Amino acid sequence: MKVAGVITEYNPFHNGHKYQLEQIKRQTSADYIVVVMSGDFVQRGEPAIIDKYERTRMALLSGADLVLELPSVFATASAEFFAGGGVSVLKNTGVVDMLCYGVESVDHELTKLVAGVLKNPPSEYSASLARLIQGGMSFPAARSRALCEYFRDTYDSASEKLDAFIASPNNILAIEYEKALMDCDITGFPIQRVGEGYHSTDSTSEFSSATAVRGVISTLIDIDKHNTITNMQLDNSWISTKFSQLIPSACADILVNCILGGHIVFPDDISEMLYYRLLTGKDKGFAQYADCTKELSAKIVKNIYKYEGFTQFCNLLKSKNLTYTRISRVLTHILLGIENNDFNICMNNPYLRILGFKKSSGELMHLLKKRASVPIITKVADAPYELISKDIFAADLYGRLCHSQQNEFTHGVVII
């Protein structure tokens, strides 16, 4: 039996994701696909647009066989910890043979070459990185420049194509995946992406990005009026037509129900909750939270009374050496109570949280129970609370945002 793994967000699931799952089956001859998916908050440091159970349903209807939750500590982290956490989950299943990931251009050798440098940084690279950061560059920009400088001096052939290669968010994740895979027996398998880029807002393509799909959703919602439909005369068929070229039909039905039911969540929906957290924590500061330096903590406190909302505050705080995404992650960590030591705690106390599976994956589920090296959680009530307390808290906050009547203790595993 051959099992492929995928680490993803599906925020939301779209045609490009379905294409990837189809290509995994076709190119690897995998019998099953195990998906490790972010829960209710995602790597950009924002709430997911629809909840994790509906996104799980989308994945299972479109080619996935088993969906596991990526703990919120890793799901909201930088690419390094996002990838490392995801690989750790796949490794702990004991059943996954390969990790398949999307790339803008398939160059597996270059990916592994760069991953090796990041895994064991040469002194030349480290010196360049430190110099560039001290010069005011953000960490992502400094890392890219330092890598280009290092490869230009050591591998001329690699340096020529490195600039374009590391400019893509998907390729950066691919590098981090390969870096994490160096510590386990799972092999990497790159899949060529099709369609629009990660940040593209073009919603006319068959393979539009998740960013573009979220943009279309936002045109149907009056965000300032608590997620009410902008035109109450809209019906299911009209909205379905809006998404017919963007996402698989089964997923479109799920998304339409979420829209009409008022279960869509946008980044600024966390604004009031976050402001409360900032006000109650300003005297102590925020340096204990993941990714937050003392300098950024001081900047947050200094500007707290200029706060108007989540995205406005992110834009207010960003600078040449602090990206919007870095700040949004920090603010989300403050909201969720994710502190610096939580990464180690989570790595040292791993678990497998099953969000959903197919009835037809009985062989896979049997093997998982036999080979998993960590606890398998299907019922939150049966799990040690301290093990998944961060995920429960994140889900409780999200449930308030999306007007859900269920919680982690009452919502069952999704079975298709």
Curated annotation (Swiss-Prot):
Superkingdom assignment: Bacteria
Gene Ontology biological process terms in this record: tRNA modification
Catalytic activity as recorded in UniProt: cytidine(34) in elongator tRNA(Met) + acetate + ATP = N(4)-acetylcytidine(34) in elongator tRNA(Met) + AMP + diphosphate
Matches recorded under InterPro entries: Cyt_trans-like, Rossmann-like_a/b/a_fold, tRNA(Met)_cyd_acetate_ligase
Entry's localization field: Cytoplasm
Single GO term (MF): ATP binding
Chain residues that bind ATP: 7-20, 102, 170, 193
Any one GO cellular component localisation term in the record: cytoplasm
Major place of residence: cytoplasm
SUPFAM superfamilies, per the entry: Nucleotidylyl transferase
UniProtKB keywords: ATP-binding, Cytoplasm, Ligase, Nucleotide-binding, RNA-binding, tRNA processing, tRNA-binding
Enzyme Commission number(s) of this protein: 6.3.4.-
Gene3D superfamilies, sorted: HUPs
EC category name: ligase
Protein family membership: Belongs to the TmcAL family.
Stated role: Catalyzes the formation of N(4)-acetylcytidine (ac(4)C) at the wobble position of elongator tRNA(Met), using acetate and ATP as substrates. First activates an acetate ion to form acetyladenylate (Ac-AMP) and then transfers the acetyl group to tRNA to form ac(4)C34.
PANTHER family registered for this protein in UniProt: TRNA(MET) CYTIDINE ACETATE LIGASE (PTHR37825:SF1)
NCBIfam families named among the record's database cross-references: cyt_tran_rel
Official protein name in the record: tRNA(Met) cytidine acetate ligase
Organism: Agathobacter rectalis (strain ATCC 33656 / DSM 3377 / JCM 17463 / KCTC 5835 / VPI 0990)
Lineage: Bacteria, Bacillati, Bacillota, Clostridia, Lachnospirales
